[in-house]
Amino acid sequence: MLEGCILAVSSQSKSAKAITNNSVPGAPNRISFAKLREPLEVPGLLDVQTESFDWLIGADSWRQRATARGDVNPTGGLEEVLTELSPIEDFSGSMSLSFSDPRFDEVKAPVDECKDKDMTYAAPLFVTAEFINNNTGEIKSQTVFMGDFPMMTEKGTFIINGTERVVVSQLVRSPGVYFDESIDKSTEKTLHSVKVIPGRGAWLEFDVDKRDTVGVRIDRKRRQPVTVLLKALGWTNEQITERFGFSEIMMSTLEKDNTAGTDEALLDIYRKLRPGEPPTKESAQTLLENLFFKEKRYDLARVGRYKVNKKLGLNTDKPITSSTLTEEDVVATIEYLVRLHEGQATMTVPGGVEVPVEVDDIDHFGNRRLRTVGELIQNQIRVGLSRMERVVRERMTTQDVEAITPQTLINIRPVVAAIKEFFGTSQLSQFMDQNNPLSGLTHKRRLSALGPGGLSRERAGLEVRDVHSSHYGRMCPIETPEGPNIGLIGSLSVYARVNPFGFIETPYRKVENGVVTDQIDYLTADEEDRHVVAQANSPLDDEGHFTEDRVLVRRKGGEVEFVSATEVDYMDVSPRQMVSVATAMIPFLEHDDANRALMGANMQRQAVPLVRSEAPLVGTGMELRAAIDAGDVVVSEKAGVVEEVSADYITVMADDGTRHTYRMRKFARSNHGTCANQRPIVDAGQRVEAGQVVADGPCTQNGEMALGKNLLVAIMPWEGHNYEDAIILSNRLVEEDVLTSIHIEEHEIDARDTKLGAEEITRDIPNVSDEVLADLDERGIVRIGAEVRDGDILVGKVTPKGETELTPEERLLRAIFGEKAREVRDTSLKVPHGESGKVIGIRVFSREDDDELPAGVNELVRVYVAQKRKISDGDKLAGRHGNKGVIGKILPVEDMPFLPDGTPVDIILNTHGVPRRMNIGQILETHLGWVAKAGWNINVAGADGVPDWAEKLPEELYSAPSDSIVATPVFDGARENELSGLLASTLPNRDGDVMVNEDGKAELFDGRSGEPFPYPVTVGYMYILKLHHLVDDKIHARSTGPYSMITQQPLGGKAQFGGQRFGEMECWAMQAYGAAYTLQELLTIKSDDTVGRVKVYEAIVKGENIPEPGIPESFKVLLKELQSLCLNVEVLSSDGAAIEMRDGDDEDLERAAANLGINLSRNESASVEDLA
């Protein structure tokens, strides 16, 4: 039964043709260099998320899958928790409350409305609650509302308060029994220990010490002889001798044990666990039972019970029922430990099963499992329900039995709060990475060892971060972050799936008597260790026999060797089986160093969507599937004919007579400020099939992932301007918007009720000219289409200001003219520093329109500003091989090097970036890019027939027109000799010239002089990505701005509109040059001399000389700190007189500030803010 859960077998017919883009109707024809046939299509890339959530809510689709797998009575996650909880009994046992049948109503609002109105995409959860009065037998049943339950969208995400979030799967150590060995430093003896780790409850640890006695630790308390525990469980000395008589160390432990009988042993354990409490036999017996043998306190979980049974060879043929420890488990664990210490290879357990005796590797994927989204939410609900259980028990005792109904007992607040807390604040519920479709897809397939119950990055060692042989086909060895999280966060491999126990499985083709079949078995890492596995590219004949006598295989632990074909059990299904989706999109990955491939996989996720997407000339065949499963393209649900197409929607009349309308997302803002826009790629009257892509999204072209642009690249130095990874670009890319992207920023402001009155959104703003208000409508909100720059008003808002004390002059003026100035201040929403763009959208939410707003908020306005960013110096570009760089110079087209036919190159990369980084894949991509762009024709009609280098190529690769798109799958792509042959077979241009030689180099001419460069240069097409590290977001300048309240020094950082810190080392430089006055200015009037700052400004305005600096505020802070340490510090002048330190209430300062119109009020965010 258990083996059945772990092994899922599916078959495919042997005649299945190679999976290419053609398996998706209407897909572009990408010519593949793959030599191997894949017998299995890539599974749904979001299944790890969607199937787990389906299990949680008990969806019909999940039940059908579970039944097909052989589960007789599948139980959903919510149902499981409610069954665990039920019944809740009161303290006397006279009444009980049980829950069953969780079900959902319709979701409250569609996904788009939830995003728009900051709502949570959720459905109301109802359960049937049954109250039973055990004294009278009376039963009251009610349907109870358990709160709004966040639902998963079709794309595997959650919408929480209007933002899209992803719950990341967590890699944790599986519950079970783990044997370990260590070397004692003093005696150099090999010592063994074992931990029994439950899903929930106390740990039980046994170990053999250097004195050769077997000890036990219960719940991490003091060690005691293991025989004490056996006696406490009711064993006599004779029984212990009978079972463990073979072992000297057990016998010596029994001799040293002073307890005589069960009662004494129980009391001994009680004293260790509860020191200071008076021990009694009953309390000791209850304590031991509660610790390990009661389901309320101890839970091995199904997976823990399965692992214990498997390791110790217990009840392997029976279904899993108990989730607590049993006496048999404890005894078998002790025997296994003893036999391990004595060096025995196997152990025969009662029932005649023989199990191998060996230590465990805790980093092995047989011992690490995934907590997927369903289980993580289930655990949180369990926490909420246990809090609710306490409330129910209290209410049972306080309320009148006759009046009790399930509704009066239940308080759903703890459950709702637990779910909200998880989605809002958990480390595993993350703001979705929406930079581009690939980043979102990868985020949903991420595996994290961090989070509650997991590791912490500070304590994680090298072993747990390292690549392990059991990761093969389960977790990608390439894709992981650089930095402190390296190895702790990974990505699921392409073909991997998660089984019901949470272990990751990978598929293999069954090999029977040396014949490879198309039967697919999914194996866990444990299962795989028992078998001999051949690699996917082992040569086969048409019948599936291995063509070579000796086959390269791997055995347990990743050991590689040659064996005869009859010894092989399984074979990989695909060469890309071991890598993740992002890594599988790197062509020629096999020629890249792993460190650079890691950067390449990570940087594809940082690519920004461009105005015009362009699919790569050189792909891997993964682009189409990744784009469709990412969910940003629109896919036809049914076959039919397109009736109507517009920029906003597509209407399809299906063959069954139903009409389907697909709406496009138009210029929406993603979580990362990039532009998500969909556009149709079908025409009215066109026939579409089910599953066909009908509209492209961001970063897609014709349904394929298109993260960058195919650019003509020359790899050469150029006047030193591309030194150290700098990049030289052609101005054509700027003028023709080749690398232009659109970025959308959201600006929000609300009008609240304040103590002094309500704030108001209005056009009537004090002290603002009509010129500034020109783009505001009558409500005070900027019009759509307005061009705005930093400092421009987007939404006018005024806030009531407290009445100030009037001067006698003002009172006189008011008495004469009877004019009362409006006591409001301008708190309008303005465009932040360094930002500009065009207003493309406005959303107004108001209480009057019955919109849901937070307490105290009357109106909320959102303004969307779009910015078109052309490529510029300082932007970061990258290829797919970790070859990244910053643009150092943009040259006019006429100055760029050009080919013999006059074509200027688009981009110049330095040659030094290749050899030491060992990412040769970029060079091969460049060559194949040129071949694909030019087209080719292999001369097979000549006297020699098919050339040697082309013998392994399929016939469809013998010729191709120009602008073909090709696929070179990872580990199964174009070979070097094929590339050389193809370069020699490229089609000539319109003048009949072939410009690139067989070695991939061309003669280039200097655009400035027209002279040829002395050596041939590698030229071809490389796929270049524009990354999210844009110079516009980083460049920053300040003249005057906000100051820190305490030190009065300028703030730091672009976000605070801060200044550039002139630090300690910079001061040393000034001192070294003797620049005393410059240094004095920097430390005083340019920084935190509050009086001096204003006086200097006054002097500059009036054209006077700069006055002497005063005392910096930070010096006053230093004095205050010393005084707070009870040190009396006085400042003396040169003649010994004490100088009084005043806190900035200088009359000169106030007068000068008033004359200059500067507000020095401490209530303002800055003491000197608007000097204009």
UniProtKB/Swiss-Prot annotation:
InterPro entries for the chain: DNA-dir_RNA_pol_bsu_ext_1_sf, DNA-dir_RNA_pol_bsu_external_1, DNA-dir_RNA_pol_su2, DNA-dir_RNAP_su2_dom, DNA-dir_RNAP_su2_hyb_sf, RNA_pol_bsu_bac, RNA_pol_bsu_CS, RNA_pol_bsu_protrusion
Assigned keywords, A-Z: DNA-directed RNA polymerase, Nucleotidyltransferase, Transcription, Transferase
Reactions catalysed according to its record: RNA(n) + a ribonucleoside 5'-triphosphate = RNA(n+1) + diphosphate
GO CC, alphabetical: DNA-directed RNA polymerase complex
Coiled-coil region(s): none
A Pfam family of this chain: RNA_pol_Rpb2_7
Highest taxon of source: Bacteria
GO molecular function: DNA binding; DNA-directed RNA polymerase activity; ribonucleoside binding
BP term (GO), one: DNA-templated transcription
Enzyme class, broadest EC rank: transferase
Name listed for the protein in its UniProt record: DNA-directed RNA polymerase subunit beta
Organism annotation: Mycobacterium sp. (strain JLS)
Designated gene of the protein: rpoB
